[in-house]
């Protein structure tokens, strides 16, 4: 566990200011993210996005000085539970923000929400918590997993692709991924493979793809998994033979390592760095200046999580004491999202637009995804109808 002293010195200085007599205590935010191993780049983006938002808001959220406590969940659900309990019981955090991976979300969901603490996920958005297991203490600033994954399925169907090969990790988000794709694609699934979470060698899977000769592949392999798969896919000579469709396999967190190997590959997303909103332009420029890298969805969604908290606390005058009032304030989504339009559905998941994006190389040599076309407008996930909240 470490407190947020780097890389943003400005936040640290602001967060350590002693409050004046009679002022509210510091707002404590616990961030839970994967910050070690091959997927660490995803957690770093999540952490960085939230920190940048706090800096841009003058070191305060809803008028209160902020203390951010960051925990590395190590992509281990049991470790995540131990650390989140420490955030709640020892550190007395007001909010928990995270995690990256859905298996970690499944583990920490009950300990956080049962404690009456608001859990805001800036990435993981599983189908079960969008439906029957929805919870008033759980808010999502990303998406319900199926939605982002459905973009590629819709594109494959509309493009007239006949045969697709599917690959994803064997955990909840992986299963949601393939379900989301198949909900829109009605052609032939020539094969469907679930690999162990964290797998880095794909020689066996690439051999099967070459033998199957599909029109396209659909891949959900985030972080280091995607970095290795894309490089090996290109090296195997398959990139010129079939369409590469994906979700969170080629994005700004992985492109610095994938580089030209990912050029021209497609993904489904709710955002891209070139999304034309004034807020987004400022965010992308600020993130690149602060961290020397192009922000990914993990960063933008956690930036929005900070804006969500700030907007809610402005409505409650900085107070988190009345949980009903706090939840109602969060539900109003009193902020301007980097993606533009944003509102919560009854299950506290966003209703938003989704895009097909394509990997491009910028004039300055950096890589990013760029919007190819809008696929869904004001899209609400299909599981909300099963959520008892209204």
Question: Where are each of the predicted segments found?
Answer:
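Extracellular/periplasmic Venus flytrap/periplasmic-binding protein
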Residues: 82, 127-130, 135-236, 271-282
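Sec/Tat signal peptide C-region and signal peptidase I cleavage site
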Residues: 16-23
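Extracellular/periplasmic periplasmic-binding protein-like sensory domains
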Residues: 230-303, 314-320, 363, 369-389
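Beta-alpha junction/loop-to-helix N-cap segments that form part of ligand/metal-binding clefts
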Residues: 26, 41-46, 56, 60-129, ...
